[in-house]
């Protein structure tokens, strides 16, 4: 089957979050199943520098505007990758979405309209001698591609749109609709208009042949006012084509048995390896070593420092957590207020709280392999990947039972035979502290703790099941000729 993926990022070329992991992992899994999957990304400088394989350049024109498609291979895979090289739009260093001050690039609407426009034309076979059976677009940055393809005469490629996080909707002033040359008839509440603004994400939600999101629970949640971000009515209307498919992870990259970032690798729960990794992590991030029997668990967090992730709950619960003997290792970046609050916590609790602002792949692996518990007190979580890394590394996660966290983490006390982590009863600081205390009681019983770790490490978190689910969806999507 010929499948065109389009996204704004893909690891290891460009990555700011889980979307980058999915764009890499799912395309790789489909290609390994001998499907002709291609990937279209913006030609950010890091992506151009990282492209592998034989590099070809296709000089093309669309809508009377010249551009180049740089063709190569996604590193570590056999996935043919095209980079949309339009220098005024994408030849910018740093974050692909925001300026150095953290503000969205002022021309983001024009940038991602162009990406969607090229994706639609490429999928339809208008640019190169290759045509897709399915166009699979991801998040608001490419959501106009299904809308643009839907307007074409049949036969046309089937369209699938994946919501990775509904909170990011791609909202722009009303005049953007006209400025981009979008058809007037699409400016309706049933079309691209959203409370007087243009919503890129509605190009996928309202017009794609099939919609997916990254867990069954999140697919149900976004059809409610509490999680629907004002789009729950549209999603209920389209519930017949809305599917929840849990993400996988790259089990070769996230493999505790052969992880070059760990001080000691391990294939099963191994207290000695955990102790070695804990010591390496403590030294790396500036924590005191273990302090004997009164020492509590080492808690870890890796993620974006935003309200969604519950970082403020960790800060509020910190005095109680530390009073119980715990230490905290935290890696992330995001909102400046939270970054500064965490720096202050590290200064206030030297040796007990270690904070690294930014992203460091090696440190992320060491946190997974060196901590005793991993904290994910998210207010909502479409899928989550860190809990899967944690389970694979034998680091039981403490999570809010929402979205993909509810689908992948089973509470030890609710289900003693299958439990692999711990659920917060509510997303607040008191619940977080109480749940960590409950988990700590299990942690202090080594034999029982090893059984909990083993259940987590024994799960299958690869892309295999997810890839098969997507293939079934592609085959059953109207308009797909199976080519």
From Swiss-Prot:
Pathway field: Glycan biosynthesis; glycogen biosynthesis
Domain of life: Bacteria
One GO-annotated biological process of the protein: glycogen biosynthetic process
Keyword Lipid biosynthesis annotated: no
Molecular function GO terms recorded: alpha-1,4-glucan glucosyltransferase (ADP-glucose donor) activity; alpha-1,4-glucan glucosyltransferase (UDP-glucose donor) activity
Electron transport listed as a keyword: no
Protein's job: Synthesizes alpha-1,4-glucan chains using ADP-glucose.
Family: Belongs to the glycosyltransferase 1 family. Bacterial/plant glycogen synthase subfamily.
Descriptive protein name: Glycogen synthase
Taxonomy of the source species: Bacteria, Pseudomonadati, Pseudomonadota, Gammaproteobacteria, Chromatiales
């Amino acid at each position: 089957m010929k499948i065109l993926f389009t996204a704004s990022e893909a690891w290891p070329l460009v990555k700011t979050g889980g979307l980058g992991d999915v764009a890499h992992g799912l395309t790789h899994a489909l290609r390994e199943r001998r499907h002709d999957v291609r990937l279209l990304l913006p030609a950010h400088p890091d992506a151009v520098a990282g492209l592998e394989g034989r590099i070809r350049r296709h000089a093309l024109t669309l809508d009377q505007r010249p551009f180049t498609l740089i063709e190569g291979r996604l590193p570590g895979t056999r996935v043919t990758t095209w980079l949309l090289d339009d220098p005024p739009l994408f030849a910018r260093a740093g974050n692909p979405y925001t300026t150095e001050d953290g503000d969205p690039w002022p021309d983001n609407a024009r940038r991602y309209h162009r990406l969607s426009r090229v994706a639609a034309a490429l999928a339809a076979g208008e640019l190169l001698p290759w045509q897709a059976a399915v166009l699979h677009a991801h998040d608001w940055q490419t959501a106009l591609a299904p809308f643009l393809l839907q307007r074409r005469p049949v036969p046309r490629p089937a369209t699938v749109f994946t919501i990775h996080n509904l909170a990011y909707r791609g909202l722009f002033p009303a005049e953007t609709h006209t400025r981009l040359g979008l058809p007037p008839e699409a400016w309706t509440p049933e079309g691209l208009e959203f409370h007087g603004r243009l919503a890129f994400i509605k190009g996928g939600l309202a017009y794609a042949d099939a919609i997916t999101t990254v867990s069954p629970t999140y697919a149900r949640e976004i059809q409610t006012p509490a999680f629907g971000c004002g789009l729950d009515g549209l999603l209920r209307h389209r519930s017949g084509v809305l599917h929840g498919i849990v993400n996988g992870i790259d089990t070769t990259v996230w493999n505790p048995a052969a992880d070059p970032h760990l001080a000691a690798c391990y294939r099963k729960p191994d207290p000695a390896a955990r102790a070695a990794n804990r010591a390496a992590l403590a030294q790396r991030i500036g924590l005191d070593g273990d302090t004997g029997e009164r020492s509590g668990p080492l808690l870890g967090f890796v993620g974006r420092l935003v309200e969604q992730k519950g970082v403020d709950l960790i800060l509020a619960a910190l005095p109680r957590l530390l009073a119980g003997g715990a230490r905290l290792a935290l890696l992330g970046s995001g909102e400046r207020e939270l970054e500064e609050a965490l720096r202050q916590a590290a200064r206030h609790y030297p040796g007990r709280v270690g904070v690294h602002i930014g992203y460091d792949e090696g440190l992320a692996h060491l946190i997974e392999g060196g901590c005793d518990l991993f904290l994910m007190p998210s207010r909502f979580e479409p899928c989550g990947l860190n809990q899967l890394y944690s389970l694979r590394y034998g680091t039981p996660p403490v999570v809010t039972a929402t979205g993909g966290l509810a689908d992948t983490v089973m509470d030890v006390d609710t289900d003693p035979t299958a439990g692999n982590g711990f659920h917060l009863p509510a997303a607040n600081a008191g619940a977080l502290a109480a749940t960590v205390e409950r988990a700590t009681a299990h942690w202090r019983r080594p034999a029982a703790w090893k059984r909990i770790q083993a259940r987590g490490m024994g799960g299958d978190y690869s892309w295999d099941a997810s890839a098969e689910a997507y293939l079934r969806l592609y085959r059953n999507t109207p308009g797909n000729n199976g080519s």
